[in-house]
């Protein structure tokens, strides 16, 4: 059977077809409408499988699934359908033709013609062995998680090496740490992170190592080379960005210079930069009330080695962490051990040296930090779905240590920071954990938010994560609302001034991350667009700034990036094939012949693919795209000046679902009705297979509501009637045409939706909120176009009802506040547990995000160019390997 014949017989129907790809072990299996293993033999026996058709087949004993193709031949009597009693009902459209081959007969918006013609016919995606290997490698990261994997710090190892023997004998307690220092000197005589040279870091590490070796009279040649390096490079600190100064540098470096002087090291003690650093230390010390140092845990505990001559160590022992450390700093703890010989300090250091082969990181543990940042990276790269169970375990681990006042980078930390707290808050909240806004209260003072309680500074990454967390606010969370405003203003100022660099991390493209957050906040961020953007921003060589530079291999590594790129390209290839089907369907419905209709097949499919990108959501995407196209042409039909009497006949035909009623209507009305009629019937058949029951009446009801509301607006326009704001919104929230798209798609989200769910208050509430958000956003950006068509908008009505409002801008600001309040409520409803499945509520949320993205600055749906770049990124431009 030829493709054209199949399309004709299908009468505007379309089903899902999948390229061959692997469904990886451990991934939730949700393939509504896809052939099940039990159906495969049935299909083969009846010779109903086409060479290009995809079926779901399991690998015996492996627990994995893959998509395979069928043999040649089709039962001619089936006319494109399976015989009665089979498990599926309709063959997918074959994929022999590329876009190039059918471009001459299928029509899309002119803006996409050139792009579609340039698109190459990609090879079918096959079982990707490499992807399986990368997934397993990442799973090993999860399995091996303990208290965190982190690179070594010469600085901290040097302080540990300085600890004298605890039995009173002459010599070091940890002599193998001295050997590690000798073995890890770099070729130019310094110590530090080999992949990046920063003056502050190299000088600080080198000075600490030279002092340790000189203290015990070992490694004379290493000491000499280290001193030569210091003599030549101390001045280079003047050229360094102050943001790259190690943690506590102004406190610890002058103290080490005093130690070096006492050892007789030949260094330029009078250098201007050293005098400046010493002056900064004095300034900071004057601000530190020593009585408070002994009373409350502060970040100063992390740098006690810089105060070892000033503090009372016995008093400080009361602030020791449970694991024996001082705020998880090996250097600070080693210094405490020198003065107190405390057994808990010794145990902490000894365990570190065993784990890390006689060296130390700059901080340990980092268990919460590692888990949170790893989950965040996997999500932003778009590959978190492969690790749902592992991610859940990670977040449960974090929640175990969650406190009302927030968290730090390590479990049971006595000091919390806004960066880790914000990251945890956002991830926990969006995964359904109960977290409250009060966790940010200690970081808020005098209208500003800070990194640590009691401090007066901000970091770009800390405010970046605070901004992301604050965007998930619920109704009534005033502190989070303040955090959202403050962090957004802070980030905007930094970005405008080209100051997007950070004191905690040196990353590939922090400015780009900030720009995306400002342009597409959570309400407007389409998942696949975020993934594609972050693929360019993710740095496999990102380096954090602690007391020395360090790396987190479970957070930034090449395997994440390889899997993310392969996954994006795999999904994109599938999406291109599906887009071909949507364009074919649009042509078979003859919608191109409708003079009044915008051609938006590509944009409609993009909206679905950018939010429901997973391969198993294929049928949901195709239903979404078809319904979106239908709402577009219906909207144009009702808006282009069609006589109201004709509209009433059209509405009656839809209401009764009777094609005979359109016999007297113009040809274009007939084309539109039959396209709607046949497509909804086809979707009803597909939904029957997905839901195992008839939902046709629900589907017809969605379209009946839509065209009834559109007719009401047409009658208002004809009569010149201006409704009240509430009266308008009651009708316009339906006429914005989101409900048929969303609610039809829900039947293909992987869950059975019974009548109790569809009739529930929760179900109708989330749809109402989405409708309200969509209508107001559409009105704000489209009011001029609507006015030219004789239609009224919420902006116009609001101004007429509130004559005291001095300007259109103020009216819009009020309406945007309504949108914001609705989004807060929608966020709450989506993230809390209700009878409506979470995957279904996610589709509601995604529609609200789509409306924000499309109507952010302009009417992006009607515009020919506003969304072009984003569409190309998601659908047409593969990620370079």
From Swiss-Prot:
The record's free-text note on cofactor binding: Binds 4 Mg(2+) ions per subunit.
Family designation: Belongs to the terpene synthase family.
Residue sites binding Mg(2+) 1 per the record: 417, 419
UniProt comment concerning the protein's domains: The Asp-Asp-Xaa-Xaa-Asp/Glu (DDXXD/E) motif is important for the ent-kaurene synthase (KS) catalytic activity, presumably through binding to Mg(2+).
UniProt KW Plastid keyword: yes
GO molecular function, one term: magnesium ion binding
Residue ranges annotated as motif DDXXD motif: 635-639
GO BP of this protein: diterpenoid biosynthetic process; ent-kaurene biosynthetic process
Catalytic activity reported: (2E,6E,10E)-geranylgeranyl diphosphate = ent-copalyl diphosphate; ent-copalyl diphosphate = ent-kaur-16-ene + diphosphate; ent-copalyl diphosphate = ent-beyerene + diphosphate; ent-copalyl diphosphate = ent-sandaracopimara-8(14),15-diene + diphosphate
Effect of loss of the gene: Lost ability to convert geranylgeranyl diphosphate (GGPP) into diterpenoids.
Cofactor(s), names only, from the UniProt record: Mg(2+)
Transit peptide endpoints, chain numbering: 1-41
Positions that bind Mg(2+) 3: 635, 639
PANTHER family: ENT-COPALYL DIPHOSPHATE SYNTHASE, CHLOROPLASTIC (PTHR31739:SF4)
Protein name: Ent-kaurene synthase CPS/KS, chloroplastic
EC numbers on record: 4.2.3.19, 4.2.3.-, 4.2.3.229, 5.5.1.13
Organism of provenance: Physcomitrium patens
Intracellular or extracellular location(s): Plastid, Chloroplast
A Pfam family of this chain: Terpene_synth
Cellular component terms per the entry's GO annotation: chloroplast
Function comment: Bifunctional copalyl diphosphate/kaurene synthase involved in the biosynthesis of labdane-related diterpenoids (LRDs) natural products such as ent-beyerene, an antimicrobial compound. Supports the conversion of geranylgeranyl diphosphate (GGPP) to ent-copalyl diphosphate (ent-CDP). Also catalyzes the subsequent cyclization of ent-CDP into many diterpenes, including ent-kaur-16-ene as the major product, and ent-beyerene, ent-sandaracopimaradiene, ent-kaur-15-ene (ent-isokaurene) and 16-hydroxy-ent-kaurene (ent-16-alpha-hydroxy-kaurene) as minor products.
């Amino acid at each position: 059977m030829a493709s054209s014949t199949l399309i004709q017989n299908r009468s505007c129907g379309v089903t899902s077809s999948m390229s061959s790809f692997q469904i990886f072990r451990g991934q939730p299996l949700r393939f509504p409408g896809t052939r099940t293993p039990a159906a495969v033999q049935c299909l083969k026996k009846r010779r109903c499988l086409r060479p290009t058709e995809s079926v779901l087949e399991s690998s015996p004993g492996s627990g994995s699934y893959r998509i395979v193709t069928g043999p040649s031949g089709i039962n001619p009597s089936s006319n494109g359908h399976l015989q009665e009693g089979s498990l599926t009902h309709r063959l997918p459209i074959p994929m022999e033709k590329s876009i190039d081959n059918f471009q001459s007969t299928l029509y899309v918006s002119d803006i996409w013609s050139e792009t579609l013609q340039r698109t190459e016919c990609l090879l079918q995606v096959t079982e990707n062995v490499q992807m399986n290997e990368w997934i397993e490698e990442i799973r090993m990261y999860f399995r091996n998680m303990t208290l965190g994997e982190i690179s070594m710090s010469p600085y901290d190892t040097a302080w540990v090496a300085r600890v004298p023997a605890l039995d009173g004998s002459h010599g070091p307690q940890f002599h193998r740490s001295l050997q590690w220092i000798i073995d890890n000197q770099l070729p130019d005589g310094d110590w530090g992170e080999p992949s990046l040279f920063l003056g502050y870091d190299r000088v600080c590490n080198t000075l600490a190592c030279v002092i340790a070796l000189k203290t015990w009279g070992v490694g004379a040649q290493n000491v000499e080379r280290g001193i030569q390096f210091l003599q030549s490079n101390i001045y280079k600190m003047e050229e360094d960005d102050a943001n790259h100064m190690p943690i506590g540098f102004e406190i610890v470096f002058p103290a080490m210079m005093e130690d070096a002087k006492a050892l007789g090291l030949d260094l330029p003690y009078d250098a201007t930069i050293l005098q400046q650093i010493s002056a900064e230390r004095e300034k900071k010390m004057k601000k530190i009330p020593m009585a408070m140092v002994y009373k409350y845990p502060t970040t100063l505990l992390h740098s006690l080695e810089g105060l070892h001559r000033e503090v009372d160590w016995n008093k400080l022992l009361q602030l020791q962490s449970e694991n024996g450390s001082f705020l998880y700093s090996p250097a600070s703890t080693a210094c405490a051990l020198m003065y107190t010989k405390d057994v808990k300090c010794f145990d902490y250091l000894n365990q570190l040296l065993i784990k890390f082969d006689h060296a130390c990181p700059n901080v340990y543990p980092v268990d919460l930090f590692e888990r949170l940042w790893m989950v965040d990276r996997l999500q932003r790269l778009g590959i978190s779905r492969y690790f749902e169970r592992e991610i859940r375990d990670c977040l449960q681990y974090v929640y175990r240590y969650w406190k009302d006042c927030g968290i730090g980078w390590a479990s049971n930390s006595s000091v919390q920071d806004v960066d880790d707290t914000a990251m945890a808050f956002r991830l926990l909240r969006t995964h359904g954990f109960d977290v409250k806004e009060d966790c940010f209260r200690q970081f808020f003072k005098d209208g500003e938010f800070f990194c640590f309680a009691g401090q007066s500074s901000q970091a770009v990454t800390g405010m970046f994560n605070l901004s992301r967390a604050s965007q998930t606010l619920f109704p009534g969370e005033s502190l989070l609302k303040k955090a959202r405003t403050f962090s957004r203003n802070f980030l905007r100022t930094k970005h405008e001034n080209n100051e997007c660099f950070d004191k905690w991390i040196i990353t590939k493209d922090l400015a780009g991350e900030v720009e995306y957050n400002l342009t597409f906040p959570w309400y407007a961020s389409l998942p696949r667009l975020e993934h594609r953007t972050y693929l360019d921003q993710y740095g496999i060589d990102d380096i954090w700034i602690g007391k020395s530079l360090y790396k987190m291999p479970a957070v930034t590594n090449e395997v994440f990036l390889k899997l993310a790129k392969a996954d994006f390209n795999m999904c994109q290839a599938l999406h291109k094939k599906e887009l071909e089907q949507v364009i074919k369907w649009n042509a078979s419905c003859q919608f191109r012949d409708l003079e009044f209709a915008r051609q938006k097949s590509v944009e409609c499919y993009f909206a679905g693919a950018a939010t429901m990108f997973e391969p198993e959501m294929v049928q949901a995407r195709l239903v979404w795209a078809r319904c979106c196209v239908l709402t577009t042409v219906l909207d144009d039909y009702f808006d282009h000046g069609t006589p109201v009497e004709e509209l009433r006949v059209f509405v009656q035909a839809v209401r009764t679902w009777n094609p005979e009623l359109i016999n007297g209507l113009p040809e274009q009305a007939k084309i539109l009705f039959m396209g709607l009629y046949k497509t909804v019937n086809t979707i009803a058949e597909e939904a029957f297979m997905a839901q195992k029951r008839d939902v046709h009446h629900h589907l017809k009801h969605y379209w009946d509501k839509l065209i009834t509301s559109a007719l009401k607006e047409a009658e208002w326009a004809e009569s010149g009637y201006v409704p009240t704001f509430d009266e308008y919104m009651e009708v316009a929230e339906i006429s914005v045409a989101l409900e048929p798209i969303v609610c039809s798609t829900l039947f293909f989200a992987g869950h059975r939706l019974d009548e109790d769910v569809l009739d529930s208050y929760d179900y109708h509430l989330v749809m109402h909120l989405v409708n309200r958000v969509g209508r107001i956003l559409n009105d704000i950006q489209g009011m001029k176009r609507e006015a030219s068509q004789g239609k009224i908008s919420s902006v116009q009505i609001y101004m007429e009802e509130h004559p005291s409002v001095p300007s259109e801008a103020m009216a819009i600001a009020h309406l945007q506040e309504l949108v914001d309040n609705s989004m807060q409520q929608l966020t709450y409803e989506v993230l809390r547990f209700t009878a409506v499945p979470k995957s279904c509520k996610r589709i509601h949320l995604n529609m609200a995000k789509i409306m924000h993205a499309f109507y952010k600055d302009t009417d992006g749906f009607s515009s020919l160019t506003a969304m072009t770049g984003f569409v190309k990124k998601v659908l047409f431009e593969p990620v370079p390997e």
